[in-house]
């Protein structure tokens, strides 16, 4: 009873540890635990809701400085007066738009998801990236191949 998927996950977790990327390693180890225990019954829910929950947690992390007062309102207001901040705002809008296209593409062309996931894991593990890659990558792919 050789489980190729488990072997792939273990290899990716090892890659995460070797590259000192605990985000990848811990995430994959959690998925391995889910896979080899009765928790595997939750995979359909994780697959359906995981992305939304991840985006919510990411948004909480990004918005926390505003909510805590670490980033004062005056700094936010000044961000509309500085050209570098305006560039950051424009890039944020573009990247968010790409992410939206990416979600649509991932839902409509599931055959691309494996490539996007492998590319993201490699980018996170080898280049110290962060796992927001699949959405942005899918958005970029949608510009090249179309949403269809």
Curated annotation (Swiss-Prot):
Compartments (UniProt record): Cell membrane
Topology versus the membrane: Multi-pass membrane protein
Keyword Membrane among UniProt keywords: yes
Alphabetized UniProt keyword annotations: Cell membrane, Membrane, Transmembrane, Transmembrane helix
Pfam families linked to this entry: DUF441
Spans through the membrane: 14-34, 51-71, 86-106, 121-141
Keyword Nucleotide-binding: no
Tree of life domain: Bacteria
Principal subcellular localization: membrane
GO cellular component, one term: plasma membrane
Signal peptide from the UniProt entry: none
Family that this chain belongs to: Belongs to the UPF0756 family.
Descriptive protein name: UPF0756 membrane protein YeaL
Organism: Escherichia coli (strain B / REL606)
Gene from which the chain derives: yeaL
């Amino acid at each position: 009873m050789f489980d190729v998927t488990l072997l792939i996950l273990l290899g990716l977790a090892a890659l995460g540890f070797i590259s000192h990327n605990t985000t990848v390693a811990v995430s994959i180890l959690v998925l391995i635990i889910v896979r080899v225990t009765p928790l595997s019954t939750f995979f359909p829910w994780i697959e359906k809701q995981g992305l939304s929950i991840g985006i919510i947690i990411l948004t909480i992390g990004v918005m926390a400085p505003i909510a805590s007062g670490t980033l004062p309102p005056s700094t936010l207001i000044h961000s509309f007066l500085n050209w570098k901040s305006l560039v950051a705002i424009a890039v944020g809008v573009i990247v968010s738009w790409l992410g939206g296209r990416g979600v649509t593409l991932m839902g409509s062309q599931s055959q691309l998801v494996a490539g996007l996931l492998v590319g993201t894991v490699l980018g996170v593990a080898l280049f110290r990236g962060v796992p927001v890659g699949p959405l942005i990558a899918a958005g970029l792919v949608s510009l090249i191949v179309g949403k269809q």
